[in-house]
Structures are given as structure tokens and as C-alpha cells.
Amino acid sequence: MHRESNSSAVLTDTASTYYRFTSTPKMPLLSVAIITHNEEANLARTLASVSWADEIIVVDSGSTDRTSEIARGFNARVIEHMWAGFAAQKNFALAQCTGDWVLSLDADEELSTELQFQMQSLLMSKPTADAFFLKRRNLFLGRWIKRGGFYPDPKLRLFRRTAANFVRTPQFEERPVHETIVFDGTAATLDYDLIHHAYPTLTNYIEHMDRYSSLGADLLVSRGRTSRSTLSFAFNVWLVPQLTFIWNYFFRLGLLDGREGLLLHLYHAIYTSWKYAKAWERARKASS
């Protein structure tokens, strides 16, 4: 049964004024869960946007930079945990949380000021929904990509940790990539943006493409989608990427996002080709 918090709002003086909640020490109102690995370039920005939360859990998988030091500077509880895959790592982080509500963030994301205000007001108002989607604003080379399917890019990130109307505790679906929350309950969408500082450089994005296309290939192999016939190989590796580019760049108006939009949709199409090609390569090696 949902516990009514005895939280009080206290106005604090910061560069971006916001309300801070204080709640009972044994049961924080809001827990923030973040997984990290060498995120010193991003983490301070992320933590600053949730510094008003009652509990911050950072699960780190062997960072060799200042990630843990930065996290502790924001009074986060840092837990070292060997890398087990995205979903497993995030589920471990969720298991450490003690708040009534959990906000799951990536280390390169931050809450906009407007979203901070809305989320704080929401948590004080006894919301009826069990989970909330956040509209994600993706930045590519510093530019907000508004079209082509990259916005509003809703992500379910805020949810009750446990509640009577959940059939099971919410958790991330076990899959190699693009993990999603699995839960039973009602969901709504908040109005303001979660800012995703995704790809500050082309080198960063190409490295991301290589890593995530490999994970995507693993998922395709697990589903038996390995382009075994010549026709399916040509369709997936050559035609699907072209259709993806045409659909997103022209029909979904990605062309209005300037040169950054052109580069992003071009490379996204290449990522699609790599994913299917790597799945075929894995199946080929397994059968030889």
C-alpha cells in the first residue's frame, strides 16, 4: 500500500532555484539510479539536475577515471559491481533503491529545469499513475534533433518502486541492448524534457554505432534473424538501411535539422546495415 510521505518542501538557493524534498531517513521519497563506466565528462551535469532527490545510487563497473569521486561529491552512494550487461546492471541498481519512487537515468542525461519542477510537484501530489514517460531531447553534435523520429523519443524512467497494484516489481527486460522497463500498472507522460547529451562528436557516435550494432546483432541472432538467404541478406543489409534513411530524413522531416540531421540519419542507416551484417557474420561463423 502506498505510504504517504511526510515530506516538506524547502526552498534552496542555487544557480537554478528549485524545491528540495526532505523525507524520513528510513524511506526516501525518490531514489535516482544511474549506472556508470568512465563517465567523468557527463556525470556531474546529470547529478546536478537530481541533487534534490532523497537518494542517489550510482552503480559503477570499474571506472578508471574520476567517476566515483564525482558521484561521492554529490553524496551519491557508489556501489562497485562487475559489468553484467545493460539490463542486468540496471536491475541491480534498482534493487539498491529504497525510495517509494525510482528515477532511472543514463549518465549522459539530465533533467531540464522545467522537468525538475514538474517532477517535484508531481511527487508531492499523490499521483494516480504508477509510472511516467519522459520526453527525451536528443542532442547530436550539440544540436537538438527535433525531427526524423528522434523527438519526443519517450522513455519510461520514473516509476513506483513497489505498489499494491503492481503484479511484479518493475524491472528492466533482459536483452542485450535497448533495455526497457517491464511493469504492470498505469502510465502517463510528463510535459517537459529529459536532455540527452548523446553524441558530442562524430568519433563518439561512430564508436557508439560499432558497439551498439554488435549488441543489436546479438539480439537478432537470439531471434533467429540472421539473413540466411541471399535475398534476405540483400534486403536487410542494403535495402532496409536505404528505406530507413528515406523514411526518417524525408517523410519524417529529418532534413529540417540541418547538416547535423543529415549526418545523423546517414549514419543511423549505416548502423542498421552493420547490425544485420554482423548478425549474418555471427551465424556464418557458428555454422562453419
Please report, for each region that a protein language model flagged, where it lies by residue:
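Short aromatic/hydrophobic "clamp" motif used to bind/position activated sugar donors
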Residues: 102
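Cell-envelope/extracellular polymer assembly enzymes that use nucleotide-activated donors
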Residues: 29-31
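Short, well-formed alpha-helical segments that are part of the catalytic scaffolds
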Residues: 34-52
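Catalytic-site signature of metal-activated, phosphate-bearing donor transferases
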Residues: 91-94, 105, 112-286
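Acidic helix N-cap motif at the loop->helix transition within catalytic regions
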Residues: 44, 65-74, 114-115
